[in-house]
Amino acid sequence: MVYTLFQVHTLKFNRKDYDTLSLFYLNRGYYNELSFRVLERCHEKASARPNDSSTMRTFTDFVSGAPIVRSLQKSTIRKYGYNLAPYMFLLLHVDELSIFSAYQASLPGEKKVDTERLKRDLCPRKPTEIKYFSQICNDMMNKKDRLGDILHIILRACALNFGAGPRGGAGDEEDRSITNEEPIIPSVDEHGLKVCKLRSPNTPRRLRKTLDAVKALLVSSCACTARDLDIFDDNNGVAMWKWIKILYHEVAQETALKDSYRITLVPSSDGVSVCGKLFNREYVRGFYFACKAQFDNLWEELNDCFYMPTVVDIASLILRNREVLFREPKRGIDEYLENDSFLQMIPVKYREIVLPKLRRDTNKMTAALKNKVTVAIDELTVPLMWMIHFAVGYPYRYPELQLLAFAGPQRNVYVDDTTRRIQLYTDYNKNGSSEPRLKTLDGLTSDYVFYFVTVLRQMQICALGNSYDAFNHDPWMDVVGFEDPDQVTNRDISRIVLYSYMFLNTAKGCLVEYATFRQYMRELPKNAPQKLNFREMRQGLIALGRHCVGSRFETDLYESATSELMANHSVQTGRNIYGVDSFSLTSVSGTTATLLQERASERWIQWLGLESDYHCSFSSTRNAEDVVAGEAASSDHHQKISRVTRKRPREPKSTNDILVAGQKLFGSSFEFRDLHQLRLCHEIYMADTPSVAVQAPPGYGKTELFHLPLIALASKGDVKYVSFLFVPYTVLLANCMIRLSRCGCLNVAPVRNFIEEGCDGVTDLYVGIYDDLASTNFTDRIAAWENIVECTFRTNNVKLGYLIVDEFHNFETEVYRQSQFGGITNLDFDAFEKAIFLSGTAPEAVADAALQRIGLTGLAKKSMDINELKRSEDLSRGLSSYPTRMFNLIKEKSEVPLGHVHKIWKKVESQPEEALKLLLALFEIEPESKAIVVASTTNEVEELACSWRKYFRVVWIHGKLGAAEKVSRTKEFVTDGSMRVLIGTKLVTEGIDIKQLMMVIMLDNRLNIIELIQGVGRLRDGGLCYLLSRKNSWAARNRKGELPPIKEGCITEQVREFYGLESKKGKKGQHVGCCGSRTDLSADTVELIERMDRLAEKQATASMSIVALPSSFQESNSSDRCRKYCSSDEDSDTCIHGSANASTNATTNSSTNATTTASTNVRTSATTTASINVRTSATTTESTNSSTNATTTASTNVRTSATTTASINVRTSATTTESTNSNTSATTTESTDSNTSATTTESTDSNTSATTTASTNSSTNATTTASTNSSTNATTTESTNASAKEDANKDGNAEDNRFHPVTDINKESYKRKGSQMVLLERKKLKAQFPNTSENMNVLQFLGFRSDEIKHLFLYGIDVYFCPEGVFTQYGLCKGCQKMFELCVCWAGQKVSYRRMAWEALAVERMLRNDEEYKEYLEDIEPYHGDPVGYLKYFSVKRGEIYSQIQRNYAWYLAITRRRETISVLDSTRGKQGSQVFRMSGRQIKELYYKVWSNLRESKTEVLQYFLNWDEKKCREEWEAKDDTVFVEALEKVGVFQRLRSMTSAGLQGPQYVKLQFSRHHRQLRSRYELSLGMHLRDQLALGVTPSKVPHWTAFLSMLIGLFCNKTFRQKLEYLLEQISEVWLLPHWLDLANVEVLAADNTRVPLYMLMVAVHKELDSDDVPDGRFDILLCRDSSREVGE
């Protein structure tokens, strides 16, 4: 409806307009920067106007109004500027675009826009002359002459989507969550041709943001020169402004409709559904307590070093102590006073008691320890933010939460003297004018907030010291208390911020960023199957307060309206929803308003129940002496927080519980598959049988046998049961988590969480793999279960439930893994209520042996019939000694499994080729189906994936991948409907449940019967299974200790033999779904077989090879799709142009009489395209050149029955094509180039004298073009049919057409016309960067010599070096990041502009420290999506950058080129300030080897240790054999996450540091590994016991940790005077490997000296080991100085 108001359909762009608009897309970064600078300058000048009383009404200030020129933060101006870029471009080209035709028809004498003057005034990087621009804006607002028409068109154009705007921040994530886009609106010119791709309209939310930006620009620009601002008056303003406000109001209303989330009430779970995602009380509590656990874990790290008072101690001693008064007026004051904090209300005697003391030597407080304190407190800030977010209930917007302050003029954190809870008075609003809201925290969260302010923040202040100066002045902070705010230093600002604001990132010098905050949202709660984003969570919290917590509307109208206002809904909400006329909290008295809000918070606190889980005394307090005594008594053990669990009434088990569970899971129509399934569920749930084994056929529903009992157990209120499920492989883990978490009936989490953190009290089922089951840590956790539960929950009603082992036959059949299962025998099985073992391939013999192998008694002597439900007579012996009851459903049903699958055994010449044929045929018949291919080796898996991905989307898995990668890929294949084929070894055959799976192909000649059954069993509802073997190569090789491979012959008979079923060999019914029998197959499977057979016959008749199948099957990944000139691609080794097959193309024209001529390049082995005309009787004869690999194409005249035969020139290896035109007597000329193996075809139309290369036959309305790429082994054929109004390129380009649905760029005449600007731009860039056809790098471009480049070379710089969002956009050309039709890459380009932009960014990083580089990234934000524009921006400073590098890195080049040698004796500061600089080379080496020996012995995580001296254990790191496992070990302990959040590594991409361990440093790695022998010789020479020096990955971890350790680097650069700062990791690694002269003039590597300095920092003495926390502003004493 809004788009009708904007009249979008009348905005028509013609061909010339498109040519002009291409300038904007080619230079978008430039126009982004231009618009930002113009708005910034206008706003700056407008804000400097004298005070103006003019106001305008807003939604929040409807009565008094808000100032017209609003105060905007720089970040807001930046985003507004980027949104304005397209419209600024329109204004600068108003004379060239046809949409401004009304303006262009101005009469003589009417005012015109001088676009040339505008460009001169505005286009400099920092525009200062904006007077003329301001006058134009005023004239447009006043509709002077026809200038109003310009603004009218620009406003209507706001409804068009000119492409993606800037990203980042909470609001942008919310935008991306809105999926209801408007339909595409076509734009047609006067010739009926769709010409412009700018037809996808803006969403209402984006349109509203665009109008916000336009309004801000109009107001600011007009205010620069206007005498007054009456034109913006609501009553007497100009008509244009009133029309803009009408537009804005309509858009705002539609935005509200669009943003209405699908929220439905779910009473059964005490929650709501938000966009299909369950959000309830358990979701909130799970998230909250996970954050609390993270806070406690970080507190434990501090407690290891200090005697930390607990949260309970501080709450009891101070917060709930009635001797401490917190009576003070609420709200901030205008002056910054020293006592404007509740800290000053705490008596001095309590301040001294709470001070933490060092556990270690009281005289040691090292720089390393201070750094550890700072980092840990920064990390626990984020979980505390989330705790507050959920505790207040009525949600905050993120900026509101971010600006919580406990002191200063913006203070909003108070302590209520009556309830002793924390109260938050906030008044944040988008317009900054909302009345304050009061929200009260519960007791538990209040204790944590109070503890953070009184203890942790003061620790952090002392650890940072008085010299801390990371914060700069920013508009969000109030700098008061200084006579001249402009003279305030960064140290002053940092001091104010630390003593005022709660949520800081002290490492970066900023408030906690949204990107850091939202990381928790992506991972928590761990048991939630679907995570909500921040906007959905906000709406969900409002809905919970409205439906689950809120009062009844009929009786508590004002109470309910208060709840809405506390969620920051506008005053219109009260009127529209509740019938209250303009209700607001100002409508009632101040006391009533406070009471209403306090009662709303109390309702939320009671509903959420956080205080009931936290044991603290509200009536009694502890004296100071008691706490002191407690500290002395707890010198070795800190006091734990006590929790109690609510006592719940006991509820007996009932057979109806299983039915109710099934209805919860599957709906009210749930029924059991058969009676066997019902009785087995009851046996597991009701009977006392301690151990049960079940064998059921694949696809029977074994998961439901334990899933339903688990749901029934979880519904009981008397006891909390915690169960465990284990599967054999990691690939099953993701599938199990997805299946068991559906509908939110169970709280599911990985077993690794239990092993690392213990039971969280929320999770019902932990899921893991066999390796977890066998781990010592899991065994220890189970052994100590009762003690842990008693200490943690203070109750015994949390018990171990079921131990479930799926596919347990692997314990016996997986011979190669049996050594890994040894730890299972140590598990205390008796601790579980019941053990359940499930398998589809475990006959009695296999089951019995498998159970005995893990330490159980085995099966009972007699199998139990399914109908027997006897209670056990004697269970006193325990589960481990009690025999397991076996339920064999296969024997009970007497049906051979897998009869529903059609099994085919084929012997073929080539297994991969035959498999590809089958897959392509399947996807032609069933395009949405999926398939699994089982290969025999890991190499074969990767080869198949590499060669098949050109045809369809492939996921491949094998055992060498890391666990996380396996889980990720499996989940992707199961959930992503576009993935077609899963290729893997036999580990993909067990337990995976995949919808749309219709085919399984097995290429492994050594599969045994179990692996065969498991693989075929993936076809749940029928399908096809092919066993492909090579002819004359099948050999049943019996591997030692394992089942023999399957034999050639009837598969069904082998299955019967395995299960012990009656043989039917030679009898009726022998073949079930095999050997051609289709009797037992479903109708759908039979139909699929018949369709496959018909397609095979059709292909055989047409004699089509596998590579000539219709290209509609050849589904390419979207990331591989690129246009003609996108030939340089650093992200992929292969580039397929025009979505065509790289090796062959086949085109059949069934509707037109077209002649297709293909052109073959002699340098490639290409196959030409044959054209078949079904409407004529003409015969096409193909002739083959015996001397080349090319196939000629014959051309047949449609209008005659003659046959045209192609001739072959054997001597020149050339192919000639003859073409005859029956309409004329002219014959085409054939031309052969004898010097090259090329085909030259010339066609002459008898009606004209012109000769064309791409021939066009006007009588057939067909155009045929042939394209040859001389640098690749590909032939690209593009065919366009002018008589059909559709895209003629149907060879896999459907998805491209979906992205650009209305741009027909294949129209040849239009293509040439529309690409003129692109060609011109391409030529300019090629001239500006002439060496991109070679292996050029940006240092060459800057002018460095080859010997300098050798040492400054930027290796390891790729797309992952760039931060997220910088040159990393998807769906665009990978070489230049532009739309494909505007691609400026050129054929033969080896180094793309995008790669050069990466390297240019790295060069800028070379010259800047962390803070300067962060500011630089903000400055170049207009170019984040435009690497070509950034290169232009970069090249302007080319000479300056070259000179700066020469100056800054002269010392580096001198050292790395060995022209200078570092000597420690030349460093005066080093000799005076460090003992290391007085050591001999021998002593430095001994210290180095000792450090590594200690790290190895204690299994300390290396990177973490050198980063901040934190001695975390990581055994897997030291046992890792390859880089992948090593990186996984680091991920498990959270090293990379900590690096990104707390160090400069956050300024690179998320994968950058991880990839340093894989491929980037091969040369340095080789050098280091060659030096290992020399290290051993040095150890022997030193007379020390030879110890293993670190392997490469550990050594690299050390250097990365030192590089990111800011404290260490500052110390090293201070002591070692010959070096300066380097900001790139490659330079740091090269520098660390140079040799230095020690005090005795012996040479040692610099990295050994680094380790010695690092060790010295860890043991530096400081005067006092106790934090001097004087809770006052004038404390000037810094600990350690």
UniProtKB/Swiss-Prot annotation:
Classification via SUPFAM superfamilies: P-loop containing nucleoside triphosphate hydrolases (SSF52540)
Enzyme class: isomerase
Helicase ATP-binding domain sequence ranges: 683-860
A single GO cellular-component term on record: nucleus
Pfam families noted in UniProt: DEAD, Helicase_C
One GO MF term attached to the UniProt entry: nucleic acid binding
E.C. code: 5.6.2.-
Entry binding sites for ATP: 696-703
GO terms under biological process: telomere maintenance via recombination
Induction: Induced in absence of telomerase TLC1.
Helicase C-terminal domain boundaries: 917-1066
InterPro entries: DEAD/DEAH_box_helicase_dom (IPR011545), Helicase_ATP-bd (IPR014001), Helicase_C-like (IPR001650), P-loop_NTPase (IPR027417), Y'_ATP-dependent_helicase (IPR050978)
Keywords: ATP-binding, Helicase, Hydrolase, Isomerase, Nucleotide-binding, Repeat
Location of region: Disordered: 1140-1307
Chain intervals with Low complexity compositional bias: 1140-1283
Job of this protein: Catalyzes DNA unwinding and is involved in telomerase-independent telomere maintenance.
Entry protein name: Y' element ATP-dependent helicase protein 1 copy 2
